[in-house]
Curated annotation (Swiss-Prot):
This is Asparagine--tRNA ligase. It catalyses: tRNA(Asn) + L-asparagine + ATP = L-asparaginyl-tRNA(Asn) + AMP + diphosphate + H(+). The gene is asnS. HAMAP family: Asn_tRNA_synth (MF_00534). Keywords: Aminoacyl-tRNA synthetase, ATP-binding, Cytoplasm, Ligase, Nucleotide-binding, Protein biosynthesis. It comes from Staphylococcus haemolyticus (strain JCSC1435).
Length: 430
């Protein structure tokens, strides 16, 4: 009977066959231990010399790392294993013998591992990170589907920039100029006027020449937009969504979190509602903490965000930033016209901003004024202005960066480990 490592527990004390790769092995004179993986998980295969043919035992001692195999044996309980079971191997068939696998069990430098990313993905820790990424995506669809959102796919080739910045990848669209999308937000706002509550999930591209542990050139975003929704209501959706994702990972990725040595005590405290601090109060807090390198009207850097998040030891919303440091489309704060109704959600443990969101301007005249102030091409935004001409309503939205969220929940140091094939400054291979 053929099965997988993940499903093998259903076949305790039965003989099964598993297709797998050999990740590592050790042996003595009378017993060999094979570390097997098949994509669904990792399992130990035990080969006892007295219980198999001489040929099988010799093969078990000689198999090379990453050779592909069919391994047949009996699944037995093993309380020492993370899985709770292992295989008592009876026979081994080599599908393909690997030679000189470059990523050996010893430590390797980051550049070497990134050059061999297509192979590094096979390691237990990288496998765990990708499984957690997959669970976050699954939980995302679950949350938005259960809360009445419609999935919409905005274009990746665009004629304008939602953020109104110069950090764009330029290309030609036949005889026209086009750009790789920085965000699907403006299109999602249009979709929200048709469907009420919408979300997108797709790649975005930013030509930022940044080498920090938080930045990728290509990354994936979840971007919901909600009609008839104000800023406070949007914050409630955001914290419910993030709480749902964290709880889903804690429930469904216990083996992966253990493989990463992730301290889950902080994740277990993540539950809506999240603390909130205004930009004004955040500046005061930082001054009191001895930060003299920031003044009102300036954006926060990584050390500032980390200090604020560490104070709460939870995800925290920083609200109502100054108008001049935020994009053109954000609704003014009626209590202070120098600020806007927006928030960034800062993850604890130094992982920084994972969500940016705001209430959107719904008044045509004000939006036209903002486009002019930001010296943007009004004609490129004509479709966006139409949303304010025909049945405009209060509406809000946000964007969550998938890779930063994966980094935070999995506890990895750098976002390069959270994308299967990361695109970084000066790295386009593999």
């Amino acid at each position: 009977m053929k099965t997988t490592i993940k499903q093998a527990k259903q076949h305790l004390n039965q003989e099964v066959t598993i297709g797998a790769w050999l990740t590592n092995k050790r042996s003595s004179g009378k017993i060999a231990f094979l570390q097997l993986r098949d994509g669904s998980g990792f399992m130990q295969g035990v080969v006892v010399k007295s219980e198999v043919s001489d040929e099988t035992f010799q093969l078990a001692k000689e198999i090379t790392q990453e050779s592909s195999l069919y391994v047949t044996g009996v699944i037995t309980e093993d309380n020492r294993s993370d899985l709770g079971y292992e295989m008592q191997v009876k026979s081994i068939e080599v599908i393909h013998e690997a030679h000189d696998y470059p990523i050996t069990p010893k430590n390797h430098g980051t550049e070497f591992l990134m050059d061999h990313r297509h192979l590094w993905l096979r390691s237990k820790k990288q496998h765990a990170v990708m499984k957690i990424r997959n669970e976050i995506i699954r939980a995302t669809y679950e949350f938005f589907n259960e809360n009445g959102f419609t999935k919409i796919d905005p274009p990746i080739l665009t004629a304008s920039a939602p953020e109104g910045t110069s950090e764009l990848f330029h290309t030609k669209y036949f005889d026209e100029d086009a750009f790789l999308s920085q965000s699907g937000q403006l299109y999602m706002e249009a979709a929200a006027m048709a469907h009420g509550r919408v979300f997108s999930f797709g790649p975005t591209f930013r030509a930022e020449k940044s080498k920090t542990r938080r930045h990728l050139i290509e990354f994936w975003m979840i971007e919901p937009e909600m009609a008839f929704t104000n800023h406070v209501e949007s914050l409630e959706v955001q914290e419910q969504y993030v709480s749902h994702v964290v709880k889903s990972v804690l429930k469904n990725c216990q083996l992966e979190l253990k493989a990463l040595d992730r301290d889950t005590s902080k994740l277990e405290k993540v539950s809506a509602p999240f603390p909130r601090i205004s930009y004004d109060d955040a500046i005061k807090f930082l001054k009191e903490e001895g930060f003299n390198d920031i003044e009102w009207g300036e954006d926060f850097g990584a050390p500032h965000e980390t200090a604020i998040a560490n104070h709460y030891d939870l995800p925290v919303f920083i609200t109502n930033y100054p108008t001049k440091i935020k994009p053109f489309y954000m609704q003014p704060n009626p209590e202070n016209e120098e600020t806007v109704l927006c928030a960034d959600l800062i993850a604890p443990e130094g992982y920084g901003e994972i969500i940016g969101g705001s209430e959107r301007i719904n008044d045509l005249e004000l939006l036209e004024q903002r486009i002019d102030e930001h010296q943007l091409d009004a004609e490129s935004y004509n479709y966006y202005l139409d949303l304010r001409r025909y049945g405009s309503v209060p509406h809000s939205g946000f964007g969550l960066g998938l890779e930063r969220t994966v980094a935070w929940i999995s506890g990895v140091e750098h976002v390069r480990e959270t994308a299967p094939f990361p695109r970084l400054l000066n790295r386009l291979y593999p």
